[in-house]
Amino acid sequence: MVHFTAEEKAIITSLWAKVNVEETGGEALGRLLVVYPWTQRFFDNFGNLSSASAIMGNPKVKAHGKKVLSSLGEAVTHMDDLKDAFAHLSRLHCDELHVDPENFRVTPGKRAVIVLAHHFGREFTPQVQAAWKKLMSAVAIAMGHKYH
């Protein structure tokens, strides 16, 4: 279990309160699909994913990105119990979607941190980045929990 300090929790919740989930979620998932094209196989029902511009403009990518980033809101509100907060999603990705748990560590969290940094600019200080990277790592661990 990952422990968050009061300062880290404050940093994370303060920034999260300013996040435009719809815009940021779509951008983060779009970047994931562009940078890691093998992940597109999990989204074969999304239609045209043939180019970066097609992906970034795809309404299904945007909608699912919003859904994914909304689940990150669960992480923000349940930092002290991520394993239980993500138990259902972990089971879904393990038992039904068969997503390799390595994908949780390598891909989505990094894209989200990059997109947050892009959107918040100077406000995304090294301390903010460190807190968010810690949260993303903890979410990856929670998402991979049912695989063990």
UniProtKB/Swiss-Prot annotation:
Record InterPro entries: Globin, Globin-like_sf, Globin/Proto, Hemoglobin_b, Hemoglobin_oxygen_transport
Record-annotated membrane-spanning stretches: none
Keyword Lyase: no
GO CC term (a single one): blood microparticle
Sequence positions that bind heme b: 64, 93
GO molecular function: haptoglobin binding; heme binding; hemoglobin alpha binding; metal ion binding; organic acid binding; oxygen binding; oxygen carrier activity; peroxidase activity
Domain of life from the UniProt record: Eukaryota
Tissues where this protein is expressed: Red blood cells.
Domain Globin residues, every copy: 3-148
Keyword Ribonucleoprotein (UniProt): no
Pfam family, one: Globin
CDD domains noted in UniProt: Hb-beta-like (cd08925)
Keyword terms, alphabetized: Heme, Iron, Metal-binding, Oxygen transport, Transport
Biological process terms in GO annotation: hydrogen peroxide catabolic process
Similarity comment: Belongs to the globin family.
Assembly: Heterotetramer of two alpha chains and two gamma chains in fetal hemoglobin (Hb F).
Physiological role: Gamma chains make up the fetal hemoglobin F, in combination with alpha chains.
Name under which the protein is recorded: Hemoglobin subunit gamma
Native species: Carlito syrichta (Philippine tarsier)
